[in-house]
A protein has these predicted regions:
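Bacterial N-terminal signal peptides that target proteins for export
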Residues: 1-7
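Anionic-ligand-binding alpha/beta catalytic cores of soluble enzymes and soluble regulatory domains
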Residues: 144-228
Length: 301
C-alpha cells in the first residue's frame, strides 16, 4: 500500500511538472497574415509548403492595384489586435524587380512585417514603433529554384520568408543583415484646426462601404468641443475644385440618422469620417482619396 501511495505521489509530481512546462511553453507556430493587391492563394500555398501546421489568413477585400497608401493604412489597422509574434506579409509592389529593398520590420510590441520597403511599412512604424529592421538575405531566404524569377517576390521571397519566420524555421536574426531602424515614409500631412475650421486630406482612404476618412484624429477634433447633433458645414475638393459641399450632423454611429442620410463621425481607428447610413458616400458623390483630396469642416454656430 505504501508503494502504491509512493507511485501515485511520483505520478502526480510528474504530471504537475509537465503541466507547468506546458503552461510556459511557447507555441510552435505563430499566425501568418497575407495582404496583397492581387489574389494571394498562391502565396498561402507557399506558406503551407513550409509547414502544414501554419495558420494562414488572407486579408479581404484585396488592396486596390499599386495602392501603397491603402496597403500602409490597412496593415496598421489590421495589426492592432494580433498577439506578439504574429507575422504579416504585405505585397503591394509596383517596383518589383528594382533596387527597392525587401525587409522584415520588428515592431516594439513584437510583431513582424515582411514587405518591400516602398512606403507600405510607414503606417506600422508610426503606430507601433520600430524595434529593428533586417534586409532579407535572398541567398538563403528565397524559395528554391526561383532565382531566375524577378516579377513575383510575393511568392518567392516574402511569403516564403514570412512562413519560415512564423513557423520557427528561422529566427528574426536569420532573416538577413541588420539595417538602420527606419523605413521609407509616405508623405501624409497632419490635419489642422485654426480659427474654428478643420482642414485635412482624405489620406486614410475609402473603405469598402464607401465611408471616407481624413487625417483629422479624435484628439484634434475634440478641440472644437463637439456634441452629438452639432451640424458641420463640409466642403470636399480635388485640386481646389469643389466636388461636394453641404452640411451634416456629428453623430455617434450610423443609426443615429435616418437611412440615406449623411453623418460625420469618429471611426474605429479614431479618425474623422463621413458616411451615408446604409449607403456609399464615396460612390454616390465621386470621392477619391490622396493628397489632392481635401476637406474643410466648420461647426455651424
Amino acid at each position: 500500500m505504501r508503494h502504491v501511495r509512493l507511485i501515485a505521489a511520483l505520478v502526480a509530481t510528474v504530471l504537475a511538472a509537465n503541466a507547468m512546462a506546458g503552461h510556459h511553453e511557447k507555441p510552435e507556430h505563430n499566425a501568418l497574415i497575407i495582404q496583397a493587391d492581387f489574389e494571394g492563394m498562391v502565396m498561402a500555398g507557399v506558406a503551407k509548403s513550409v509547414s502544414k501546421k501554419l495558420e494562414v489568413f488572407n486579408v479581404r477585400p484585396l488592396i486596390s492595384l499599386y495602392d501603397i497608401r491603402a496597403a500602409s493604412e490597412t496593415l496598421a489597422y489590421n495589426a492592432q489586435t494580433w498577439p506578439e509574434g504574429t507575422v504579416f506579409v504585405s505585397v503591394v509592389d509596383p517596383g518589383v524587380g528594382t533596387a527597392r529593398k525587401s525587409v522584415v520590420l520588428e515592431t516594439k510590441n513584437g510583431l513582424y512585417f515582411v514587405s518591400p520597403d516602398n512606403g507600405t511599412l510607414s503606417g506600422v512604424a508610426d503606430a507601433y514603433g520600430i524595434s529593428a529592421v533586417r534586409e532579407i538575405d535572398e541567398t538563403v531566404n528565397r524559395r528554391p529554384n526561383t532565382e531566375w524569377a524577378h516579377t513575383f517576390h510575393g511568392r518567392d521571397v516574402y511569403s516564403y520568408t514570412g512562413a519560415r519566420l512564423a513557423a520557427g524555421v528561422i529566427s528574426f536574426e536569420q532573416v538577413g543583415p541588420l539595417l538602420e531602424p527606419e523605413v521609407i515614409q509616405l508623405e501624409i500631412s497632419a490635419g489642422t484646426y485654426e480659427e474654428r475650421v478643420f482642414e485635412g486630406q482624405v489620406a486614410g482612404g475609402v473603405d469598402r462601404l464607401g465611408n471616407i476618412y481624413f487625417n483629422i484624429d479624435r484628439e484634434l477634433f475634440e478641440r472644437d468641443k463637439p456634441e452629438y447633433g452639432d451640424i458641420y458645414e463640409i466642403a470636399i475638393t480635388n485640386r481646389e475644385r469643389i466636388v461636394w459641399e453641404g452640411a451634416m450632423p456629428y453623430a455617434k454611429s450610423f443609426g443615429a440618422v435616418a437611412v440615406g442620410e449623411n453623418l460625420l463621425f469618429i471611426n474605429s481607428s479614431g479618425l474623422l469620417s463621413i458616411a451615408i447610413n446604409q449607403g456609399n458616400f464615396a460612390e454616390a458623390n465621386g470621392i477619391g482619396y490622396g493628397a489632392d483630396w481635401r476637406i474643410s469642416a466648420r461647426k455651424r454656430r
